[in-house]
């Protein structure tokens, strides 16, 4: 019960009011707010989550050819969602990122480290 006995609206702004009005939405992947600003020069210091990635070369032959969107990034791994979800170690692969109509190749060893730590390395140089 609400203050002074008044019933308030039991919903968040922009949401359906009644229980049966929920809209089933398709799954989507957050691809970053400024993903169009990614270039070959700044990809090392940019957020990789949401970019489309493909593995070009790897020390393990089963990793070659995996492609999908980057879902998560840790210090030493990338989580890529394509046909299924793969956790890929950064240090053993060469990746190709698709940004708009450009393709950017980068060695995974250059990506080792958390994104915020890679940015610090840039400013220390």
From Swiss-Prot:
Keywords: Cytoplasm, Endonuclease, Hydrolase, Nuclease, tRNA processing. GO terms for cellular component: cytoplasm; ribonuclease P complex. Its EC number is 3.1.26.5. It catalyses: Endonucleolytic cleavage of RNA, removing 5'-extranucleotides from tRNA precursor. Residues 1-13 have a biased composition (Basic and acidic residues). Pfam families: RNase_P-MRP_p29. Disulfide bonds: none annotated. GO terms for biological process: tRNA 5'-leader removal. Its main location: cytoplasm. It is found in: Cytoplasm. One of its GO terms (molecular function) is ribonuclease P activity. Residues 1-24 are annotated as: Disordered. Transmembrane segments: none annotated. Part of ribonuclease P, a protein complex that generates mature tRNA molecules by cleaving their 5'-ends. HAMAP family: RNase_P_1 (MF_00754). Belongs to the eukaryotic/archaeal RNase P protein component 1 family. Consists of a catalytic RNA component and at least 4-5 protein subunits. This is Ribonuclease P protein component 1. It comes from Thermococcus onnurineus (strain NA1). The lineage of its organism: Archaea, Methanobacteriati, Methanobacteriota, Thermococci, Thermococcales. The gene is rnp1.
